């Protein structure tokens, strides 16, 4: 028979330490990615000593993980100026600026990897789907041939759009739960549009 939690806290000497550790956790901002998800996404990105970009960057955890993977140059396109400043201050050697994920100042075929994060708490709207389509179009423009795309998003936000996108081939889809919603990490690579089936 298992004792209830209150009895365990009263009786066990390690309970005080457990409660102290529980209270010490930093509350995450809404829409922030967990560090383990960021590490997995950075691993799938296979950046190496090349250039990478993050579209729709809302926090510093993903840029820090990608930078730690040994990327040469990292560019983050953020939805607001405050996030861009935060990333530049926390992740050294990273270029971050406010802008649209669908229209960047990156040169054609200049990136080996592009990562995208769609916050899972956002409501699915026509605008969200349109923004994702524009971001994927921009991604194909800035990626070098056979470049890699990593998308982190809720299934209901991105699955149908990613399936219909031309010029990319899905290498793998890895399910996970983010903020209580079914989500996934999609790993894709660019292909010539005429090679598609």
What would you call each of these model-derived segments?
Residues 73-78:
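Conserved SAM-binding motif I beta-strand of class I
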Residues 148-197:
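C-terminal catalytic and target-recognition region of SAM-dependent MTase-like enzymes
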Residues 59-72:
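Conserved SAM-binding loop of SAM-dependent methyltransferases across substrates and taxa
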């Amino acid at each position: 028979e298992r004792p209830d939690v209150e009895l365990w806290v009263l009786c066990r000497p390690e309970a005080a330490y457990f409660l102290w550790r529980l209270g010490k956790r930093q509350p995450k901002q809404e829409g922030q990615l967990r560090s383990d998800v960021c590490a997995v996404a950075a691993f799938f990105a296979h950046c190496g000593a090349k250039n990478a970009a993050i579209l729709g960057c809302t926090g510093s955890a993903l840029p820090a993980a990608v930078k730690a993977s040994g990327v040469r140059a990292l560019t983050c396109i953020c939805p607001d100026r405050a996030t861009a400043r935060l990333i530049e201050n926390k992740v050294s050697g990273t270029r971050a600026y406010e802008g649209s994920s669908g229209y960047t100042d990156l040169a054609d075929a200049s990136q080996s990897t592009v990562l995208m994060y769609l916050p899972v708490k956002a409501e699915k709207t026509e605008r969200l789907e349109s923004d994702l389509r524009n971001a994927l179009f921009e991604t194909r423009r800035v990626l070098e041939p056979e470049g890699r795309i990593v998308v982190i998003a809720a299934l209901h936000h991105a699955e149908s759009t990613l399936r219909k996108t031309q010029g990319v081939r899905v290498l793998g889809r890895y399910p996970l739960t983010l903020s209580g919603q079914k989500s996934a990490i999609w790993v894709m690579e660019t292909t010539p549009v005429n090679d598609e089936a």
